[in-house]
Amino acid sequence: SRLLPYLEADGILSGNPSLGELGRLREVAALIQTRIAHLTEAGALVAPFFAPDDMVDVADDARAQLGEDAVRVLDAASTALQALPDEHSGVLASESTWTAPAIEAALRAAVIDGLGLKPKVAFTPLRTAVSGRRISPPLFESMEILGKTATLTRLDALRSTL
């Protein structure tokens, strides 16, 4: 809740965020708390989680570091993530099979083992697609928070610009 005034001032959230936005913010705040020294720094890391999935603003430095394998990585990642189940169970369907460990395992198999790439090369296009930034909260946890549909939309959106 201490973040809200800063996010409102940055135009990321309104003064009256929905319960869904507050829930997502709680998850994102847990990811970024060790990556910022001051609350004023939170906006850049939080903003991508509230951007329209097909309109993530890709920073110039993030786009510049996309290597020649970016298209192959995005295609392989999309295929692997589409095959990953996204089923919900438990009280209020609060338990999901779309989890950071499952996402990480699928992506490592597809882009590191499958394409024979080093993690930095393999995950840079994915981080750029998900956050639009070179530096972001942890990738797999970010994908879990965003959900399967949003993650795939973001991968496709970046892919369509390459």
What name fits each language-model region?
Residues 98-157, 161-162:
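Charged substrate- and nucleic-acid-binding regions of tRNA-handling and nucleotidyl-transfer enzymes
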Residues 2-114:
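Small-residue-rich helix-loop
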